[in-house]
């Protein structure tokens, strides 16, 4: 993706990099209802992020078989941690492509540093590492991503489509996917019951 390639070569960060994007009540696009998106790259050319609280039906072992990383017999023998690794729905764009957000203890040449603590890798090498227990300490994987053109996300935020707040590794990698939306709102002092459509930035 051009935006990620640009981020690897450009100095500095966009002001929405390493932020949570939280869908406001009344989100008009059903694909993003109650969604939390982690922004991986942002610049004047656009933005790219991954929904972190929607899951796919596909299981991680099945994905490894589909990608030719291992056969079905090898997939059956995966350690429990790899078998239970949740595949998430990262967004409506390029849904056949996989992305792994992970802690900075694992880096390869293709890894994109989003923040001091968080990297993004989109190659099969990290899937092999995770399946063999040699992967990062914390990771989440998603198929597809969420993307915006130049100025599009800024407009949606200004029109109160989204709240933004700084991301934290603890909430990003927290395994409680169902409660992630409410927990992130609570972390910035917002009760969903009192959140109005006119709310601004957190």
UniProtKB/Swiss-Prot annotation:
UniProt xrefs under InterPro entries: AlgH-like
Cellular component, GO annotation: cytosol
Superkingdom of this protein's organism: Bacteria
Pfam families tied to this protein: DUF179
Family affiliation: Belongs to the UPF0301 (AlgH) family.
HAMAP family, per the entry: UPF0301
Name under which the protein is recorded: UPF0301 protein mlr7511
């Amino acid at each position: 993706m051009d935006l990620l390639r640009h981020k690897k070569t450009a100095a500095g960060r966009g002001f929405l990099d390493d932020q949570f994007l939280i869908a406001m009540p009344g989100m008009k696009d059903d694909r993003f209802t109650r969604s939390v998106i982690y922004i991986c790259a942002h610049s004047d050319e656009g933005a790219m992020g991954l929904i972190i609280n929607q899951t796919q039906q596909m299981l991680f072992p099945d994905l490894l078989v589909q990608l030719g990383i291992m056969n079905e017999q090898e997939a059956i023998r995966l350690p429990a941690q790899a078998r239970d690794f949740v595949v998430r729905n990262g967004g409506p764009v390029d849904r056949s492509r996989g992305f792994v957000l992970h802690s900075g203890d694992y880096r390869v040449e293709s890894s994109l540093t989003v923040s001091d603590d968080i990297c993004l890798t989109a190659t099969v090498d990290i899937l092999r590492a995770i399946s063999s227990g040699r992967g990062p300490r914390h990771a989440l994987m998603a198929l597809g991503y969420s993307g915006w053109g130049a100025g599009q996300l800024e407009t949606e935020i200004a029109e109160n489509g989204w709240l933004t707040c700084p991301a934290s590794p603890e909430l990003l990698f927290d395994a409680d996917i169902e409660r992630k939306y409410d927990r992130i709102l609570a972390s910035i002092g917002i009760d969903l019951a009192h959140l109005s459509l006119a709310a601004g930035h957190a």
